[in-house]
Design a protein with these regions (language model features):
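Intrinsically disordered, low-complexity acidic/polar segments
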Residues: 33, 112, 214, 228-230
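Surface-exposed helix-capping loop/turn segments at secondary-structure junctions
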Residues: 60-66, 190-202, 215, 285-289
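Conserved metal-phosphate-binding beta-hairpin within the catalytic cores
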Residues: 103, 202-223
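Coil-to-beta-strand transition motifs
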Residues: 21, 96-98, 198-202, 214-217
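A long amphipathic alpha-helix within ATP-dependent nucleotide-binding catalytic cores
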Residues: 169-203
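Active-site loop/lid in soluble adenylation, ligation, and acyl-transfer enzymes
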Residues: 1-148, 261-289
């Protein structure tokens, strides 16, 4: 059996080169505030992979994505070991674009903090009088740069995203920036409407895109997982304060309340975290993992 070594290790994912494709493995690691925590969250990698698969299938009519298969039988023998089953995705190789495409439709988190000070989120003027967790009149696109592990992503304007892309792809900066913005908002609208019908509010999320061998923009990375999105229960939604969530916010809140934890979570926080991830998956897909 041929051994495979990851060519890249991210905060949560490991990427393996499979010749004309890549194999992306979502581990059970969890990160918060750009730090990888000491604990593993059992089944988390499977939730991330299977939820991405669900959304990639759901949005294929809008634009192509990089997913080829999540069935390990389609992958080399090395990936047919138990630790890869359910949390591995074989993907097309793309030239990734250096922008994190963030879309927000509810005011929360760093956006709420910024709005309280300036009335703006990432430089975008918002209506006066919004309360925490209010729905915005329209989704807003707030791109950021992609940071290396240990660094923080930097929020940038749409105009700045044109510059960043133009530098790397001369003659295509505006074309790619426009496509990223328009695809991001279209994907969000389609998926947020579906999620609402299943009892989940998608407050905000992040997409990443790449180019295929013909220069087409293709959706890559993960899609609408509890790691890349804020999911709130529709039942009990009430603006004016922060909302309960199905995502990492629970971990972030615990870490903020326990600054001396040295990023070491107690077991009950881990158990509650995976329960929230699984509940979100089951609500959205109607399936159990």
């Amino acid at each position: 059996m041929t051994e495979f070594k990851p060519i890249k290790e991210g905060k949560v994912r490991e990427i393996y080169d499979n010749g004309d494709s890549l194999i992306m493995v979502a581990t059970d690691r969890i990160s918060a505030f750009d730090v990888i925590l000491k604990n593993k969250v059992t089944k988390k990698g499977t939730v991330l992979t299977q939820m991405s698969k669900f959304w990639f299938d759901y949005t294929r009519d809008l634009l192509p994505n990089h997913m080829l298969s999540v069935d390990v039988k389609d992958m080399p023998e090395f990936f047919q070991q138990p630790q890869f089953d359910g949390n591995s995705m074989m993907c097309r190789k793309l030239t990734m674009l250096p922008i994190e495409c963030i879309v927000r439709c509810y005011i929360t988190g760093s956006g709420w903090a910024s709005y309280q000070k300036t009335g703006k989120v990432c430089g975008i003027q918002l209506p006066e009088g919004l309360k925490e967790s209010d729905k915005l009149p329209e989704p807003i696109y707030t791109p950021s740069t992609k940071a290396e592990i240990g660094d923080h992503d930097e929020n940038i304007s749409y105009e700045k995203s044109i510059e960043v892309l133009e530098k790397q792809f001369p003659g295509h900066g505006e074309e790619y920036a426009t496509k990223l913005r328009d695809y991001t908002i279209a994907l969000y609208k389609k998926c947020a409407e579906y999620a609402l019908s299943r009892g989940i509010i998608i407050a905000d999320t992040k997409f990443e895109f790449g180019l295929d061998e013909n220069g087409n923009v293709v959706l890559g990375d993960e899609m609408l997982t509890p790691d890349s999105s804020r999911f709130w229960p529709l039942e009990g939604y009430e603006p004016g304060h922060s909302q309960p969530s199905f995502d990492k916010q629970f971990v972030r809140d615990w870490l903020k309340a326990n600054p001396d934890s040295n990023y070491d979570l107690p077991q009950d926080v881990i158990d509650k975290t995976i329960a929230k991830y699984l509940e979100a998956y089951e609500l959205l897909t109607g399936k159990k993992l």
